[in-house]
Amino acid sequence: MGRAKKVVLAYSGGVDTSVCIPYLKQEWGVEEVITLAADLGQGDELEPIREKALKSGASESLVADVKESFIKDYAFPAIQANALYENRYPLGTALARPLIAKILVEAAEKYGADAIAHGCTGKGNDQVRFDVSCTALNPKLKILAPAREWGMSREATIAYGEKFGIPSPVKKSSPYSIDKNLLGRSIEAGALEDPKFEPPEEIYEMTKAIADTPNEPEYIEIGFTQGLPTTINGTPKDPVALIQELNQLVGSHGVGRIDMIENRLVGIKSREIYESPAMLVLIQAHRDLESLTLTADVSHYKRGIEETYSQIVYNGLWYSPLKAALDAFIQKTQERVSGIVRVKLFKGNATIVGRWSDSSLYTPDLATYGAEDQFDHKAAEGFIYVWGLPTRIWAQQDRG
């Protein structure tokens, strides 16, 4: 008896997920494999991917256009949370995984499958994200991960696929592993595994080299409504179009590259290269607008929430009770985060140069040092006395 009767496989069209189809059937006795490819704005032609799955042995090949949900339900909440894993990575790949898990579970329930499968290895973070998310959404479904068990090298995997007519898309001149969606690109493997190696310019696609960027700065104004980006230069944009336009605008000035040593959930460090122009600038602008519209105590407390939020999303806990609790806090903080942020783009830098809001807590008459100053300077003495009282008492006791 096989490990499952009918399986829905997360499918990308790459060699690993393509090899999973015959492997599940031949080695694990699965009777039927249905593939599901998610259109996350990666730009691939999905019809050839669908056809490749069928040629590889899938009984049915599904394609789901989830771009709008990806931005509205996953990316935008992350912007409200100022989510940057280890203060650098805006979680472009990590945010896609719970959405893919959701549509996998929905497809499994619709087609009567008893298992879900993916092509993740035992070394990465995605296996955790898929397994935990799918289990949270439907604990009754089995999770199959052939690449975690088959023990084949990259070369052996390619050779196995060739026995079933599956060609390898990887060329010797391009050895990198790339994941792409609307939020950006992640690039790893090959020579990049040496952390002292400078990434070659050829790996970048969304961001221009500094030498090729305009010699004049460009100013853009990003409008937010309750923490959600809604306009560019005063023009309302739907979520997908807003991300696409910002990726182009920001990337053309060389902004959006990340080269970092990342602490993976599975306990190892990895060298990761990311391109994420829109997300980086949106988080930077959103955080700046919060500094104008949130009280000091909420702003300071939210920083700790943001770090926890980033960690649990990175670690695959999107559907956890803690994530739901953090969401409730973050949504409450966003009620007054509406306004416009002006950003200067020039030679690889995005600089906030202005911000304004009807909910601004900045009071010019109190902040000024000019003649218009309305701050009661005499009140400071009493405040300082009370504020410093615990320290004064401690000092007196300490000196005996």
Curated annotation (Swiss-Prot):
PROSITE patterns: ARGININOSUCCIN_SYN_1 (PS00564), ARGININOSUCCIN_SYN_2 (PS00565). Pfam families: Arginosuc_syn_C (PF20979), Arginosuc_synth (PF00764). ATP binds at A10, Y11, S12, G13, G14, V15, D16, T17, S18, A38, G119. Its EC number is 6.3.4.5. Belongs to the argininosuccinate synthase family. Type 1 subfamily. This is Argininosuccinate synthase. It comes from Trichormus variabilis (strain ATCC 29413 / PCC 7937). L-aspartate binds at T121, N125, D126. One of its GO terms (cellular component) is cytoplasm. Homotetramer. NCBIfam families: argG, PRK00509.1. GO terms for biological process: argininosuccinate metabolic process; L-arginine biosynthetic process; urea cycle. Pathway: Amino-acid biosynthesis; L-arginine biosynthesis; L-arginine from L-ornithine and carbamoyl phosphate: step 2/3.
